[in-house]
Amino acid sequence: MLLKIPNVLSKEQVETAKSKLLDADWADGNITAGYQSAKAKNNLQLPENSPIAIELGDIVLTALAQNNMFMSAALPLKIFPPLFNCYQGGRSFGVHVDNAIRQVPGTPVKVRTDISMTLFLSEPDEYEGGELVIEDTYGSQSVKLAAGDMVLYPATSLHSVTPVTKGRRLASFFWLQSMVNSDEKRTLLFDMDMAIQSLRAQVDDSPEIVQLTGVYHNLLRQWAQT
């Protein structure tokens, strides 16, 4: 499932993030690249222990915890702390696949990367190029969203970032381990949850809606790992 989630961050939160990132000390993006992706990666990134990265990461995680669409689609179990990158001056990231396992720095915690996420922090008209290109079942999907919007997609997907030829592209990127590691099962659960919420908004709870809700939770009970 490739899903675009609007307004994860408010305009005020985006502006706060951008102002802090403009004064940040950027490093070579290969500090977190795996062996394969390091050959394709050419961007700037905040070090994982950067106070700015930690502060902004907490803002992102708080916003996600309050976002019903994200929670329904991702069913998060463990979230890798958000990272932040910058593309400018022709920098890009060639086709690659994300590492299957990430260890949270300074801890023994390991996160299986079921879902990849990119949260855009620059408006589309602030830079040229910089599209996130994701290879999925239906071919290549080119994604370039408004600041504050986020895309999530299976971490098994090949993906790339096209060269930024003008301006600066700021974003947060991170991964999560879902309670349901199958993308197909997550998609079914998400579609069912969205349909139930839509029905509930149109009519009061009926026996049928209650029954469908029970089916959803029983499927989640069968498939979830906690």
UniProtKB/Swiss-Prot annotation:
Q: Which GO terms describe its molecular function?
A: 2-oxoglutarate-dependent dioxygenase activity; iron ion binding; L-ascorbic acid binding
- For whether the record's keyword set contains Oxidoreductase, the answer is yes
What residue stretches are annotated with the Fe2OG dioxygenase domain? Answer: 78-178
Give the matching Pfam families: 2OG-FeII_Oxy_3, PKHD_C
* InterPro entries, A to Z: Oxoglu/Fe-dep_dioxygenase_dom, PKHD_C, PKHD_hydroxylase, Pro_4_hyd_alph, Pro_4_hyd_alph_FE2OG_OXY
What are the EC numbers? 1.14.11.-
**Which superkingdom does the taxonomy of this entry point to?**
Bacteria
For activity, the cofactor(s) needed are:
Fe(2+); L-ascorbate
Detail which positions bind Fe cation.
H96, D98, H159
The record's cofactor note says: Binds 1 Fe(2+) ion per subunit.
**Keyword annotations:** Dioxygenase, Iron, Metal-binding, Oxidoreductase, Vitamin C
Q: Which residue ranges does UniProt annotate as crossing the membrane? A: none
Sequence positions that bind 2-oxoglutarate: R169
| One BP term from GO | intracellular iron ion homeostasis
Which NCBIfam families does the annotation name? PRK05467.1-2 (NF003973), PRK05467.1-3 (NF003974), PRK05467.1-4 (NF003975)
Q: What is this protein called?
A: PKHD-type hydroxylase Sde_2812
